[in-house]
Amino acid sequence: MSLVKLESSDEKVFEIEKEIACMSVTIKNMIEDIGESDSPIPLPNVTSTILEKVLDYCRHHHQHPSPQGDDKKDEKRLDDIPPYDRDFCKVDQPTLFELILAANYLDIKPLLDVTCKTVANMIRGKTPEEIRKIFNIKNDFTPEEEEQIRKENEWCEDKGGN
């Protein structure tokens, strides 16, 4: 079991099994490019707090792999988040968004999928006003602009009939 060292943006070094670290395509490519080394792999876009959470996620999924299903079908389902992942994503919004950015940067598709599904579930069924409130977004449209947008997008409104 070989170990690799990862260095967060705030210069904290983590030592982890290479096999687990390689769940990140970015890290796997870095290891392939630079070869095995005692020097830590720098991850300038990930803080130690977030990297620690990401590594916890990777350790768990390395020990408890998810059953392989039909990826295309699973990607579209928002309500099929496994219990561990659901609990993992029960964090404050800034942390959730940092996890999304880290998963994207590190190219860990399952983590990116579950964090994005979590955000999608946060806004499912909400009005634009409710979504603005959830994400603290200022509405900078005039009432006239808003009405025009509503008219242009009437076709995609859910009218309650399935």
Swiss-Prot record:
There are two genes coding for Skp1, they only differ in a single position in the coding region. Multiprotein complex (SCF) with cullin and F-box-containing protein. Capable of undergoing aggregation. It comes from Dictyostelium discoideum (Social amoeba). SMART domains: Skp1. It is found in: Cytoplasm; Nucleus. The gene is fpaA. Signal peptide: none annotated. This is SCF ubiquitin ligase complex protein SKP1a. SUPFAM superfamilies: POZ domain (SSF54695), Skp1 dimerisation domain-like (SSF81382). The modification 4-hydroxyproline is found at P143. Glycans are attached at P143.
